[in-house]
Design a protein with these regions (language model features):
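Glycine-rich phosphate-binding loop of actin/hexokinase-like ATP-binding domains
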Residues: 51-110
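Glycine-rich beta-strand-to-loop/alpha-helix junction loops that act as flexible
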Residues: 1, 32, 64-67, 171-180
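Short, well-ordered, mixed-charge alpha-helical segments that flank or form enzyme active sites
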Residues: 36-39, 69-73, 120
Length: 180
């Protein structure tokens, strides 16, 4: 197929239209997280290392909570596997326990780990809609609901990263990226 539609925005991209408009020989449409993994060599000097470690293979996991939740895996810095991990539901019921929330509805991982998730969970608990930035400010000011939400977010992110690192055997590291 020559077209893709974004899942969290109202955009549709078509390779034929892009090729014609920009007079290109070829046009490849990539998943956003596939592009992020391919860009590693171009941005590696600006990466902030949170924890040093020894690599035991060349598999790197890229994860980014932002508007949604994106992820990809790069093997030997050549083969990139794009994922739609944000749309998965396998572990979400147990992650809701990090926020002391019970739900009978279908919840995706990005409903728990993303900037919009922080806002939505805060609204569920406080009946007030705030941006994730405003909630982080409240967290710094020791607001109990913001603390509960941010602590639940961090626990959920850590648990999910652990599961994904095991799933993809990312012995080359885990890189966090995105707008959050």
């Amino acid at each position: 197929n020559e077209s893709i539609a974004m899942t969290n925005r109202d955009y549709i991209f078509n390779t034929n239209e892009i090729t014609k408009k920009f007079n290109l020989k070829k046009c490849y449409l990539l998943n956003d997280w596939e592009a992020i993994a391919h860009s590693f060599n171009y941005v590696c000097d600006s990466i902030i290392n949170i924890k040093e470690g020894e690599s035991y293979n060349n598999t790197v996991l890229y994860l980014g909570p932002g508007t949604g939740l994106g992820a990809s895996v790069a093997i030997n810095n050549q083969f990139v596997l794009a994922t739609e991990v944000g749309n998965t539901t396998n572990s979400t019921k147990s992650l809701l326990n990090n926020f002391n929330i019970e739900s009978n509805t279908i919840v995706t991982l990005e409903n728990i780990i993303s900037g919009s998730a922080i806002s939505n969970i805060y609204k569920l608990k406080a009946n007030t809609l705030l941006t994730s930035e405003e909630i982080l400010d409240k967290y710094v000011q020791k607001d109990p609901i913001a603390i509960d939400v941010m602590d639940g977010f961090i626990k959920s992110l850590a648990q999910s990263l652990s599961d994904l690192a095991l799933t993809f055997n990312s012995g080359g590291g885990i890189l966090l990226a995105g707008s959050l």
